[in-house]
Amino acid sequence: MTNILSPEKIENDQELPIRPSYLQEFVGQQQIKENLSVFIKAAKSRNEHLDHTLFYGPPGLGKTTLAKIISNEIGGNFKSTSGPAILKAADLAAILTNLEKNDVLFIDEIHRLNTAVEEVLYPAMEDFELDIIIGEGPAARSVKITLPKFTLIGATTRLGLLSNPLRDRFGIPMRLNFYNTEELKKVLNRASKLFDIDLTDSGSEEIAKRSRGTPRIALRLLRRIRDFAAVDGKSRVDKEISDFGLNRLEVDHIGLDSNDYRYLKFIADNYNGGPVGIETIAAALSEQRDALEETIEPYLIQIGLLQRTPRGRVITIAAFEHLKMPIPNQSHHQFNIFNENE
């Protein structure tokens, strides 16, 4: 699922020129920044490596950026890979043996590591040792290789899919949360200076309110609104051109697009608001379950239009009101579901 409001990184996203390099430049996630600053200073004062760190939460909130910032702050090299790219234990061994002291190894989508790779990672994280089997059959022998003290940073949008043994080996787990409007305005204002865009306060607020609490989406929308302004002969991005451009992009006043409406209307029209299983929704909308769970559902839940329950997905009364649809008489089913969870 690729669209203007996807929190996933897409090919034409230009984040590198505006990516902050140090914690003091990073906007939002204040508690995470403050805690990381303490942990980094403490590790440096003891001349130790930073504890292995796990960032989790919806996509587009800055997990990769924070990993690079940590690397800059502790003065190590930054090595990046992803769970799907490490197919076998030998792939991980090759990466680990090329690390130096204080290096940061960033593994995106770490929940997608297979079991064989995880088994190699455990002693590397705990004891900084790598067990390698040399030879085959009766002649095979195990050789231990000592690794330099490095910091592993994992990132995942699906914490529940991370195995317990792997999750427990991270000394610093941190959840990234959606941004509020004021934080997104700061992100946009910083980017507008780097992109040389004349962005007014009302323009940045309009874009921020419709960016689904996600900096990556806000920056993408800013670039598209700049295009509308340029073609319309406007030298600045104000509220008027922002509203015009966002309407053309079919982004409504709370950040919903056609995919969100398809999702909500399917449950409203066919299941009277729910509950309905995610597999049924995915099949009906011809979408992958993962795409719905990572791209659409988190924001709908955040703004109170959707709930996940043991019996399936349920849209709220607020969702019916936003869709301008009559609230079904059976709306008491939502309260029955809450009671089951108590």
Swiss-Prot record:
- For the region Head domain (RuvB-H), what residue ranges are annotated? 253-342
Check the record and name the InterPro entries matching this protein.
Answer: AAA+_ATPase, AAA_lid_4, DNA_helicase_Holl-junc_RuvB, P-loop_NTPase, RuvB-like_N, RuvB_C, WH-like_DNA-bd_sf, WH_DNA-bd_sf
TM annotation in the entry: none
Q: Which reaction does it catalyse?
A: ATP + H2O = ADP + phosphate + H(+)
Instruction: Note whether Amino-acid biosynthesis occurs among the keywords.
Output: no
Give GO cellular component annotations, separated by semicolons: cytoplasm; Holliday junction resolvase complex
Q: What is stated as this protein's family in its record?
A: Belongs to the RuvB family.
Its name, as the record gives it, is Holliday junction branch migration complex subunit RuvB
Source organism per entry reads Rickettsia felis (strain ATCC VR-1525 / URRWXCal2)
